[in-house]
């Protein structure tokens, strides 16, 4: 004798759909947080690569940091990204993955970098020649690059003060869980909460 299979009732289907909706509502914030953490890790990696490029630049340029260009030369010569591009040749590392500003065209002597998400410390990246590392007392406490709202353009240093913790201005971008990633002159990258950074 063949048994007849019963179909699901409407109530059973509604219960299953409700359970799935509850699970989705519970898991969505977890996935969003994981995505944000992944972006923060990628940003840290980007800054670390720029830090390694800067260390190679220092070795090749008499221990002087990249120089900035005069204001009138920002768009035509590009400043610090052009200086580092020979050492960090992936244009993606110049953009934070959380930066949603549109790409702004900037001529960088033919370099592939069209947009930059990081702002350098003008006390380090300064008029030619760049600052000599011997002039910096504690490389591990002086900022080199921070997450910033540059509008996608190349900027050559708008950090206030001497570029240490607590001297960052309003251009910083709080892209990562209420804080930002900061590359220090010695090459290490650290996340800091907004209140600590400014």
Indicate where each model-derived feature is located.
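Amphipathic alpha-helical segments typified by the pilin-like N-terminal helix
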Residues: 2-45
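Short, well-structured segments within or immediately adjacent to enzyme catalytic domains
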Residues: 41-198
């Amino acid at each position: 004798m063949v048994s007849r299979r019963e179909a699901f009732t409407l109530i059973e289907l509604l219960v299953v759909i409700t359970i799935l909706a509850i699970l989705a509502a519970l898991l969505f914030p977890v996935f969003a947080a994981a995505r944000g953490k992944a972006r923060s890790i990628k940003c840290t990696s980007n800054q670390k690569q720029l830090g390694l490029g800067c260390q190679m630049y220092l070795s090749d340029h008499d221990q002087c940091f990249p120089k900035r260009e005069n204001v009138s030369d920002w768009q035509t010569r590009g400043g610090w990204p052009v200086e580092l591009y020979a050492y960090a040749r992936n244009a993606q590392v110049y953009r934070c993955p959380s930066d949603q500003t549109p790409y702004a065209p900037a001529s960088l002597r033919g370099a592939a970098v069209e947009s930059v998400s990081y702002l350098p410390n003008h006390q380090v990246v300064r008029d030619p020649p760049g600052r000599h590392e011997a002039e910096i007392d504690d490389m591990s406490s002086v900022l080199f690059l921070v997450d910033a709202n540059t509008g996608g353009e190349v900027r050559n240093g708008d950090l206030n003060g001497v570029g240490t913790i607590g001297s960052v201005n309003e251009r910083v971008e709080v892209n990562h869980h209420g804080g930002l990633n900061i590359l220090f002159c010695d090459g290490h990258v650290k996340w800091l909460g907004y209140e600590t950074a400014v």
